[in-house]
Curated annotation (Swiss-Prot):
Binding site for Mg(2+): 180
Cofactor(s) demanded: Mg(2+)
Family (UniProt): In the N-terminal section; belongs to the MobA family. In the C-terminal section; belongs to the CDP-alcohol phosphatidyltransferase class-I family.
Protein name (Swiss-Prot/TrEMBL): Bifunctional IPC transferase and DIPP synthase
pH-activity profile: Optimum pH is between 6.5 and 7.5.
Main localization category: membrane
Assembly mode: Forms a mixture of monomers and dimers in solution, with prevalence of the monomeric form.
GO CC terms: membrane
Presence of keyword Nucleotide-binding: no
Record function comment: Involved in biosynthesis of di-myo-inositol phosphate (DIP), a widespread organic solute in microorganisms adapted to hot environments. Catalyzes the condensation of CTP and L-myo-inositol-1-phosphate into CDP-L-myo-inositol, as well as the biosynthesis of di-myo-inositol-1,3'-phosphate-1'-phosphate (DIPP) from CDP-L-myo-inositol and L-myo-inositol-1-phosphate. The cytidylyltransferase is absolutely specific for CTP and L-myo-inositol-1-P.
Lipid bilayer topology: Multi-pass membrane protein
GO biological process: phospholipid biosynthetic process
Enzyme Commission identifier(s): 2.7.7.74, 2.7.8.34
Length: 490
């Protein structure tokens, strides 16, 4: 079903594109035009506020509506800086965490924004050329006075926005968690617990009665720091106009003059990128934040991630997720072939491939390049490497063939049970049954165990038999526990 509104990105920006039966369509239509009929807790229209659209629950599907359509704001991105501290490279086009700063910002804001107004000067053509094939609804507003400051850049956007709009900086990096909270705020979005910025360089704010009382980098007493993100309305230009004749118009002066309200988004990832060292710090922060919240085994949490995140941070701007998947696969396949020459060496390479296997996901999430296709290919290649490694060792030591068969079967079934659950129920089995996060037998744990036994095989080949036996035992036990958990669940 499509409820058409304004066009955005080739698709109506205010539309709902959902699969619903006609009964649900009727309920949705009734709710839009007769919201009082949906005032219960299970199917309700929330109170309208100036900063967030109401939500309605229709057969479990929350639909955001605003007078019959989704309410989206415009977003102004100030990108008129000279980029002098980054070797003349336009800051918005600097790649951080595998994604250009302005592209990251626009991707994360897209669900909330109808049009982007990008205020640029010297690098306007470069930014336009970069964005023209990205599918965004945007407008470049040019001016030739970047030396007048970011407050003047805001003034330049005056005739291109109305009502409420988002204002952000072209050299700031934000996480998705920050954006989702910030767009629901009002005025200055500030942070009382900044974890990723140099406080000495940050713009500090003194708050009184919930509004900006003082603002500046040199404040000795302050309550929070400015994140470079604002949710404003067009009344801000009345205050900006009072400063128009100044040689330089800092945005902070406009903020102080307007006594903007302050909304706190504390402790989330955000930072401004001014230097090459900032780029490196942002890479590390974005990759660390990209570690998936569930599904990792004990070895991944305690060992692998500590290494893989460092590797990912070093290469995130040079390698895409698919290339990283291929590299991990090739190392894994080579580890299997190395068994013909040295079992201990093969085990070490196998463990290294397991560490690298975490990098593609970290890079994909950090660079906002996640895809179902990439996850599918990665999963298939992992199964291939696991089978190849164990099969070659079983071939080299045929006396272990029977127990090796159970080890290979169990290894495949561990992955199959979790992937099949996700396919059938549409959610991660590790989120549903958290106890499975602590039962041994995940891929990272099996590979680490295999490495240990491969190293011990240098002392006695009898350890090869015990390797297969242990892998079979923990993997099949995990499969049985998983099945029981699903069967007894409601």
């Amino acid at each position: 079903m499509i409820l058409p509104c304004e066009s955005f990105n080739g698709v109506p920006s205010g539309c709902l594109i959902i699969e619903m039966n006609w009964y649900s369509v009727l309920k949705a239509s009734t709710a839009i035009f007769f919201p009082e009929k949906y005032s219960s807790s299970t199917s309700s229209l929330s109170k309208r506020s100036p900063i967030s659209a109401p939500m309605i629950n229709v057969d479990g599907e929350y639909l955001k509506i605003f007078a019959g359509r989704i309410k989206l704001m415009k977003a102004v991105i100030l990108a008129a800086g000279l980029g002098t501290r980054l070797g003349g490279v336009p800051k918005p086009l600097v790649r951080v965490g595998g994604c250009e700063i302005i592209l990251r910002t626009m991707k994360l804001l897209s669900p909330h924004v109808s049009e982007f107004i990008i205020v640029a000067s010297r690098y306007a053509d470069d930014i336009d050329a970069f964005l023209k094939d990205k599918g965004f609804n945007y407008k470049i507003v040019r001016h030739d006075r970047p030396e007048k400051g970011n407050g003047y850049s805001l003034l330049v956007a005056k005739n291109h926005v109305e009502d409420r709009f988002i204002l952000t900086m072209g050299d700031h990096v934000y996480s998705q968690q920050f954006i989702e909270k910030a767009v629901r705020g009002e005025g200055v979005i500030a942070d009382r617990e900044p974890r990723f910025v140099d406080i000495g360089e940050a713009t500090k704010i003194r708050v009184e009665d919930g509004r900006v009382a003082k603002i500046g980098k040199d404040l000795r007493e302050f309550d929070c720091v400015d994140t470079g993100f604002f949710v404003l309305d067009d009344s801000i230009f009345e205050h900006a106009e009072k400063l128009r004749d100044r040689e330089e118009i800092p945005l902070s002066e406009i903020v102080k003059l307007a006594r903007l309200p302050v909304t706190y988004v504390d402790g989330e990832l955000w930072m401004d990128v001014d230097t090459k060292e900032d780029v490196r710090r942002a890479n590390r922060a974005l990759v660390s934040a990209a570690v998936k919240g569930s599904g990792d085994g004990f070895i991944s949490r305690k060992i692998n991630r500590k290494i893989s995140t460092r590797i990912s941070a070093a290469i995130v701007n040079k390698v895409n997720p698919n290339q990283m998947t291929l590299i991990s696969f090739l190392v894994g396949a080579f580890s299997a072939l190395a068994s013909f020459f040295s079992i201990p060496l093969a085990g070490l390479l196998y463990q290294f491939s397991s560490i690298l296997d975490g990098c593609d996901g970290e890079i994909a999430r950090a660079s906002l390049k996640m895809s179902k296709k990439g996850g599918y290919v990665d999963s298939i290649l992992d199964r291939f490497v696991d089978f190849l490694f164990l099969a070659i060792i079983a071939l080299l030591y045929p006396k272990t063939a029977t127990v090796a068969m159970f080890a290979i079967f169990g290894s495949v079934m561990v992955s199959y049970t979790s992937e099949k659950y996700k396919a059938e129920f549409g959610e991660s089995i590790f989120g549903k049954f958290r106890v499975l996060n602590y039962i041994p037998g995940k891929r990272d744990e099996r590979i680490f165990l295999i490495m240990i036994f491969c190293l011990l095989s240098a002392i006695s080949l009898q350890w090869i038999f015990w390797m297969f036996l242990f892998v079979a035992a923990i993997s099949l036990t995990r499969v049985v526990v998983t099945l029981l958990a699903v069967l007894v669940s409601k």
